[in-house]
Swiss-Prot record:
InterPro entries: ATP_synth_F1_ATPase_gsu, ATP_synth_F1_gsu
Keyword entries, A-Z: ATP synthesis, Cell membrane, CF(1), Hydrogen ion transport, Ion transport, Membrane, Transport
Any one GO biological process: proton motive force-driven plasma membrane ATP synthesis
Subunit composition and interactions: F-type ATPases have 2 components, CF(1) - the catalytic core - and CF(0) - the membrane proton channel. CF(1) has five subunits: alpha(3), beta(3), gamma(1), delta(1), epsilon(1). CF(0) has three main subunits: a, b and c.
Name of the protein: ATP synthase gamma chain
Disulfide bonds: none
Length: 290
């Protein structure tokens, strides 16, 4: 049995850990609310943009549309793997990387050119041994994501070199459910998990005048904007999932520390009682010998 001093020190250490996990849980909850608000605004924007492109695509010549979207060429891929810079969020980082590995390895096995961009240092640390280093193009910090930063990144990479752009990220469903998914953001598709269908409304009942009067130019511009907006929205989805996963992980840690403290308190009291009983027996035995 451990000594009273050892038990007391262990209880003190666990209480210190409990304070930290409680604070982290509260911070994650606050960040989750902020992430959800940003995500809601982003979904509204990308859903409206998606609706406009859908309407233009209906009125465009199919051969022209195929040329704009590069539908017939799938040789060059750019893949974004979005996770976190930090841990303490359960299997959040590893699940996204593991999910992406299977899909990426299939592309590489079929002799496709694949470049990978990691968002999050933990994602890179988890994935660097799973992929060939020659396929890793960049590693980006997942903190402080803004639309301007995403626009600069997209411009720096030059997405025109790639026929397909895919994003692996953790989709936020609710506080207790986040799921790794794959989203193709180039070429544009009428089906997307990033949009909110409740705010998408068809625009085909209206008559529009385009300026400039060149539907090819307009569609190219809008689909490029859509790629940037989609990547930004996926990053916000991932941030919400990360904060939710960390909040749940810290809540679980708090429960575990409470259980440990209860067990240690019981053990401490029993040890203390045993020590007092032993002292009393020794005192009584000494008195009787006198």
């Amino acid at each position: 049995m451990k000594s009273l001093k050892e038990l007391s020190l262990r209880i003190k250490n666990i209480k210190s850990v409990q304070k930290i996990t409680k604070i982290m849980q509260m911070v994650s909850a606050a960040k989750l609310l902020q992430s959800q608000k940003k995500l809601s605004n982003s979904k509204l924007h990308i859903s409206k943009l998606h609706s406009i492109i859908s309407s233009l695509a209906l009125s465009a010549d199919q051969e022209l549309l195929a040329r704009i979207l590069n539908i017939n060429n799938e040789d060059s891929f750019l893949v974004f793997i979005i996770a976190s810079d930090r841990g303490l969020c359960g299997s959040f980082n590893s699940s996204v990387v593991k999910f992406s590995q299977e899909h990426i390895n299939k592309l590489i096995a079929n002799d496709k050119k694949v470049d990978i961009v990691f968002f999050g240092k933990k994602a890179f640390e988890t994935g660097k041994n799973r992929f060939n280093s020659k396929n890793i193009l960049k590693v980006e910090n997942s903190k402080g994501i803004t639309l301007k930063r995403v626009e600069a990144l997209v411009s720096d990479i030059d997405l025109s070199k790639y026929n397909k752009v895919k994003v692996f990220y953790s989709k936020f469903y609710n506080t207790f459910m986040q799921k790794p998914i794959l989203e193709t953001i180039k070429p544009w598709s009428k089906d997307s998990l990033l949009i909110d269908n409740s705010v998408v409304s068809p625009l085909t009942d209206y008559s529009y005048e385009y300026e400039p009067q060149n539907i090819e130019f307009i569609l190219k511009s809008l689909t490029q904007d859509y790629v940037t907006a989609s990547l930004y929205s996926a990053l916000l989805e991932s941030a919400a999932s990360e904060n939710s996963a960390r909040m749940v992980a810290m809540e679980s840690a708090n429960r575990n520390t409470k259980e440990m403290l209860n067990k240690l308190a019981l053990l401490y009291n029993r040890s203390r009682q045993a020590a007092i009983t032993t002292d009393l027996i020794e005192v009584i035995g000494g008195a009787e010998s006198l």
